Amino acid sequence: MFQNNMKQRMNWEDFYGPNLGYALELYDQYAEDPDSIDPDLKDMFDELGAPPSQIKEASGTKEQGRVTADLIQKIAAAVKLAEDIRTYGHLNASVNPLRKDPKKSELFPLSDYGLTEEEMKAIPASVICKDAPANITNGLEAIQHLRNTYKRTISFEFDHVHDFEERAWITKMVESGELFRKNSPEKLSAVLERLTEVEGFEQFLHRTFVGQKRFSIEGLDALVPVLDDIIAQSVKAGTTNVNIGMAHRGRLNVLAHVLGKPYEIIFSEFQHAPNKDLVPSEGSTGISYGWTGDVKYHLGADRQLQDAETKSARITLANNPSHLEFINPIVEGSTRAAQETRTQKGYPVQDETKSLAILIHGDAAFPGEGIVAETLNLSSLKGYQVGGAIHIIANNMIGFTTESDESRSTKYASDLAKGYEIPIVHVNADDPEACLSAVKFAVEYRKRFNKDFLIDLIGYRRYGHNEMDEPSTTQPMLYDAVRKHPTVKRIFAEKLVSEGLISEEKAQNIETAVTKRIEDAYKKVPAKKEDAVREIELPEPVSNGFPDVDTAIDFDVLRKLNGELINWPESFNVFGKLKRILERRAKAFDDDRKVEWSLAESLAFASILKDGTPIRLTGQDSERGTFAQRNLVLHDSETGEEFVALHHLDDCAASFTVHNSPLSEGSVLGFEYGYNVYSPETLVMWEAQYGDFANAAQVYFDQFISAGRAKWGQKSGLVMLLPHGYEGQGPEHSSGRVERFLQLAAENNWTVANLTSAAQYFHILRRQAKMLLREEIRPLVIMTPKSLLRNPNTVSEVQELSESRFKPVYEQSGLSHAYEKVTRVVLSSGKVSIDISDHFNKMEGDKDWLHIARIEQLYPFPAKDTKELFAKLPNLQEIVWVQEEPQNMGAWSYISPYLSEIAPKGVNVQYIGRRRRSSPAEGDPTVHKKEQERIVSDSLTRKN
């Protein structure tokens, strides 16, 4: 990549006199045959291009050029040397605090490039380093300046950044000395005080709570002042929201010093009895607990920060499990939500300056966890970009007991970021001033280019993976060096004293004051006492569940909404076949009064928007729909221009977002969860391409969506649409694994539904939207249809939208009301219910012995409605649960205890479906069809 920078530094005006004459002679040779000259010269002329005419006229003779025939080659070699220093200088940098002399031999000797000091002195400094400080007067001084710049305790990698403007800006920041301006004594003193707090807090925990896990920050103490400075600079520039994601290493220290969580609360958590009375009453720090709670080093917090210039900002450390790196897209989703205004129709209005994402990674986890690459891939996508996240690798050079050469195949932990053209700074965590330079670089780069930036903060881990672990058993040499190594607080204090910036007395006074604050806080913690074991109780709104809400929409309002949905500009050319499909939707309110699935969805969206609730829908192919059913974004067949009818509703003051997502489940679902947590008033929806692929995001279902409220008090109303149904498409396109969601279902933690009618879908979406800001809110998982999208048995009468509501139990239409004759009730959920309905409608003869109902809401189980159904059937003998999934999958294992509990005395509960299998579905469509027919037939066949 050195040619780009050479072009930045050299042009034809840099040559004059004999040198210019020789350069022109060489260029003529290059023009005749580019391969006939030295490769470095060829690269140079490739970039310089043809000389301007006035240059040729001003040149000397060829004879003059031959006087210094090799000078131009020396210049090319010098430029190559300079570029090599920029590209590879990091290899000679002092960024490892435990290794003081990283390279015994100097890289980039002049002799390797065929150069001497005298020759370098003859070259202008501007040819080598355009941005060098004014005191650099020649090429030799310029090269030495570059060597010193790129081999400090901070080093740089940006050769992978291809944008010329970015590279030029980065180069100027580094080489001009802009990054390395001296900090004021006051700021350095404040950094020392912060490092003293960081160390003092850890050492107090180490002495007081012996052997308890805390995942100490020691060895990477500088992380805290780094965060302080990122936040301070960002808030000063206008940021009003900062979202931080990090794992457990150093988390308690960040909570205490960056989030302002009082020491006494953290100490009380070590007593295994968090004292919620200790939470600050003024509300500057928000700390929430769920009813089952979590360990102290997973908890997050909110802080309302006010700086000296009266600028305020909300700082959030996201709640996080021990699943490393999975918090990343959640933080970015929250950041995007904080950046957007959603109180107008159309797409939200994004202001990237309003919110900042800071993601703290582990050196083993950053290259090791695939979710990192998934999240980095979001960084430039219009539906997900956040104007640049600042990444910090908290690099202690070890993962539990695993060395770096065992945990990654790259030189640096940060190398993955190169694929996304993210500038990288490696910095020694024992040099706080270098760390502040890295912060300045990151903040200024993001401000200018709205892109990600990475700081590789290289330190060490003073203790084992946790405080009960002895690291010397596996890394004896490393931990011998660590034990002998002074702390960064001590190193920095001695440096400031030696430079006369503070006195020894002041350094000691800082330490004394910090120790007193910590000890005073500990005195506030009540004495530990053994409380009686108590039953964990759910908050009343959670326990009570959803109240009945009115979700019907007046017929005339629906008709008007429908008209707006098919109202595109006259000049807009809708694709012919699609146009006919959309125009048929008008008949739903004129002729047949029938609403199919996709129209019901669009009407639900339109009515929710009219109610003032913003909507965000993303997923693979979600604009059109995997099954070409949705078509929310129309494309002009002649110009490609887009039109979204939901952006043009009359009297609407809520935004509508729909984006096709990248081919990722984990990062996208995590992003939408984070967006929803930050923006609880928005109906946020994620759609899987097929429900089968949702398990690629299983961590988010298990650790966050199903359990986040119980662990952290973190509410969510996220909607997940998982296409599900057995249609002979094999084991990868049949099952959304409903059994997994039902296994996780407890404590009213989410709604799991498997729907069979357009009206049911309409009402459940509207119900979810109406519940968003209420305490009862919970996530919604819907097993959505595929072939049923166009099945006439799933269409609904318009009247069902305008007069009805969501029905957890949905009775088959066309049944006899001779309830006393019924001996079998067939219960099912989802697509198999439609198969049963089709077969039932074709049956001849006596059918009064059968009653059929669909359990549309699987969880929370509608016990009351189901019990009332059974009560209508006085002679009931059999309750049959029918499913198309294998017996060890689907809803059977979950629902059979519920049915047995409420079944009338003496009535058996039976199973009809596929037998237990390891794979969810058959691969052969013929075998599938035969098995499906058996299941349906058995469910509707009377026993002899």
UniProtKB/Swiss-Prot annotation:
Segments crossing the lipid bilayer: none
GO terms, molecular function: oxoglutarate dehydrogenase (succinyl-transferring) activity; thiamine pyrophosphate binding
Documented EC number(s): 1.2.4.2
Subunit structure: Homodimer. Part of the 2-oxoglutarate dehydrogenase (OGDH) complex composed of E1 (2-oxoglutarate dehydrogenase), E2 (dihydrolipoamide succinyltransferase) and E3 (dihydrolipoamide dehydrogenase); the complex contains multiple copies of the three enzymatic components (E1, E2 and E3).
Family annotation (NCBIfam families): 2oxo_dh_E1, PRK09404.1, PRK12270.1
Biological function: E1 component of the 2-oxoglutarate dehydrogenase (OGDH) complex which catalyzes the decarboxylation of 2-oxoglutarate, the first step in the conversion of 2-oxoglutarate to succinyl-CoA and CO(2).
Name assigned to this protein: 2-oxoglutarate dehydrogenase E1 component
Organism whose genome encodes this protein: Bacillus velezensis (strain DSM 23117 / BGSC 10A6 / LMG 26770 / FZB42)
Gene name per UniProt: odhA
